[in-house]
Every structure is written in C-alpha cells, then in structure tokens.
C-alpha cells in the first residue's frame, strides 16, 4: 500500500539548482504551511512516486570522551552529562549489531565514533574492517568519526564505504555560539576530502538551538548550493540533554521540523532527507507530516547514539499508518 493516487498528476521534471539565494530560501520557509506542503509534495512525488523510505540504523561504536565542545552534545568532555565513556567495540561485536539491524529491516548501517578526528592505527584498522563486514552483509555502510585526512578518506573508499556523515549543525552565522573547538571551514574541508575520495556525503543540521529562521535558511543555502547536493540530509531537532549548555531550551515546535523537511526537499530534490534526532518528541502525527513533506529516510532503532529513539515496533506501525513503501520482506 502507498499513498500515491495515480489520478493526481505529478510534475515529471524537477529542476536541480545550486545557486539558491538566502532570500529565496527564507521565502520558501515562511510560506503558508499548506502551500509549502503542496510544493514539497509536487517535488517529492516527481522523484519518489512510490514513496520509498530508507531505514538507516545507527550504532555508537565509541561513546563519550570527545574533545569537541558542542553545546548540544552529551558526549563532550566539556559537558557534565551522565554519559559513560565506552571503549571501542571489537569488529565482531559491531557486525553482530549490523546483522540484527538488517534482520529488523534496516538497509543502511551507520557507525559513529565520538572523536574530533579519525585516529590512525588499531582504531582505524578496526573501522575499515567494520565497513568491509557491513558491506559483506549487503548493507550500505556509513561512518561518522569527525575530521579525516585525504589518505584516510581514500582507504575508506577502497573498502567500499557508501557515505560519510559530517554535519554542519547550524548556519555559519550561528555556529560560533554552539561550537568553538572546530571551525565551519574545518567541516567544509572535511566534506571536500570525502568527496574527492569518491564517497558520498551525509550532511545536515539541528534546529532548536536558539537560531533564527534566517539561520535555518542560511544552513540550507550552504547545503543546497553544494554541487552535487549531499546524498543524505539529516534534519535533527534538538533533544535538550541535562548537563549540556542547551539543557534548558524547549523542544522545537513540530511544525518547524515539517517546514525544514519540506524546504530541504524543494531545494535538494534528489537527496535523501532523513528524519533524525528528536523524532520521539515529535509524535506520530508530526512525523507523518514530515514524511508527506518529503522525508524519505529515518534513523531506525531504539537508540540514536546517546538519545532515545522510537522503538522498532512503533516505527513499523508509523510507516504502515503512513502507507509508505518499505522493504518489509527483510523482516518476514
């Protein structure tokens, strides 16, 4: 079952642009909600007429002890959250988790290391073995491990890494209020190295960190003017964590997530727009609106690094209610 009604005409050609202005994007973000949803739907139907949704599972391989001072993150050594530092899993343990994710229906397995940059030596060799193993299971492999060198990117490409996640987090203008230990340019250069190695990038941001609407438009402008667009664009809602500088912020209005997803879909028609952190707080109805607005991937599994995520059972019910197309045969 899908939501697609064959009697509703859809636009067959979608123009892909890389020259969006800040004013254009802000105007899209501020459109009346129904008009914004209609425009995003028109694009989404054209590029994804079967409403296919990718299920991506995310495992924290190395948790805590990160030298970055990201204001939102429970894993930073500068914050006083109660996250327990966890040593690197061995390769076998990670691949067992990947097998379980595949058995539950995931088709992409993402692995995260709480590092400022990838560490050469035994940790990096283990990372390469994990990527090889995930690929041998028939899953797409994604890694997030901070900054990396050209040589490290090349070796990850050699073992078949599909995507490297390195988020921009927020706009260039708001960035210094959130992070001081890594520059925006550092992030852009990391993405450049990944692309030069032939690996696709997974790159998005977080809303609800005290930014303005103009900041959100500015973040989207950076992403939408990358040529080519990121393969995946994760859209996160801040989950305030006790012990972090942003612990007292309120959860973002769910309709702001809908707007962000819809605008990302319009700007980057062929990218995967991934509903990421904060889904549990959004609720079922807002998540379905996000799927309607153009989200075509979710992070799937009971935890998302160090924050909770909807249960697999809840997500199966959500996706069935929405009528989107998922490879359910992986389960049954």
UniProtKB/Swiss-Prot annotation:
Alphabetically sorted, this entry's keywords are: 2Fe-2S, 4Fe-4S, Biotin biosynthesis, Iron, Iron-sulfur, Metal-binding, S-adenosyl-L-methionine, Transferase
- Gene3D superfamilies xref list: Aldolase class I
Please, one GO biological process term?
Answer: biotin biosynthetic process
Task: Give the pathway annotation.
Answer: Cofactor biosynthesis; biotin biosynthesis; biotin from 7,8-diaminononanoate: step 2/2
- What cofactor does this one take? [4Fe-4S] cluster; [2Fe-2S] cluster
Q: Which Pfam families match?
A: BATS, Radical_SAM
Disulfide bond entries: none
Where is [4Fe-4S] cluster annotated to bind?
66, 70, 73
Catalytic function, reaction form: (4R,5S)-dethiobiotin + (sulfur carrier)-SH + 2 reduced [2Fe-2S]-[ferredoxin] + 2 S-adenosyl-L-methionine = (sulfur carrier)-H + biotin + 2 5'-deoxyadenosine + 2 L-methionine + 2 oxidized [2Fe-2S]-[ferredoxin]
- Name the Gene Ontology molecular function terms of this record: 2 iron, 2 sulfur cluster binding; 4 iron, 4 sulfur cluster binding; biotin synthase activity; iron ion binding
Recorded family membership:
Belongs to the radical SAM superfamily. Biotin synthase family.
Function field:
Catalyzes the conversion of dethiobiotin (DTB) to biotin by the insertion of a sulfur atom into dethiobiotin via a radical-based mechanism.
What name does the UniProt record give this protein? Biotin synthase
UniProt organism field: Prochlorococcus marinus (strain SARG / CCMP1375 / SS120)
């Amino acid at each position: 079952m899908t939501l697609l009604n064959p009697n509703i005409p859809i636009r067959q050609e979608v123009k892909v642009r890389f020259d969006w202005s800040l004013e254009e994007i802000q105007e899209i973000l501020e459109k009346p909600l129904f008009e914004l949803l209609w425009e995003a739907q028109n694009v989404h139907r054209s590029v994804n007429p079967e409403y296919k949704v990718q299920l991506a599972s995310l495992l924290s391989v190395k948790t805590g002890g990160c030298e970055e001072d990201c204001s939102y993150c429970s894993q930073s050594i500068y914050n006083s959250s109660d996250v327990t530092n966890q040593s690197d899993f061995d390769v076998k343990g990670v691949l067992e988790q990947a097998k379980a994710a595949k058995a539950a229906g995931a088709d992409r397995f993402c692995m995260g290391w709480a590092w400022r940059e990838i560490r050469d030596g035994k940790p990096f060799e283990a990372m390469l073995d994990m990527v090889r193993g995930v690929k041998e299971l028939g899953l797409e492999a994604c890694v997030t491990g901070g900054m990396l060198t050209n040589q490290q990117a090349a070796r990850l490409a050699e073992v078949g890494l599909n995507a490297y996640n390195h988020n921009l987090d927020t706009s260039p203008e708001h960035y210094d209020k959130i992070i001081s230990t890594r520059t925006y340019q550092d992030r852009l250069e990391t993405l450049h190295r990944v692309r030069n190695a032939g690996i696709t990038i997974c790159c998005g941001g977080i809303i609800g960190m005290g930014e303005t609407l103009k900041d959100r438009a500015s973040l989207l402008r950076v992403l939408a003017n990358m040529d080519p667009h990121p393969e995946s664009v994760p859209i996160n809602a801040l989950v305030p964590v006790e012990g972090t500088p942003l612990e007292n912020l309120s959860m973002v209005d769910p309709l702001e997530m809908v707007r962000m997803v819809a605008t990302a879909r319009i700007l980057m028609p062929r990218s995967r727009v991934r509903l990421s952190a904060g889904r549990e707080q959004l609720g079922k109805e807002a998540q379905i609106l996000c799927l309607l607005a153009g989200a075509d991937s979710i992070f799937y599994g009971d935890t998302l690094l160090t924050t909770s995520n909807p249960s697999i059972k809840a997500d199966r019910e959500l996706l069935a209610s929405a009528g989107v197309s998922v490879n359910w045969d992986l389960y049954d």
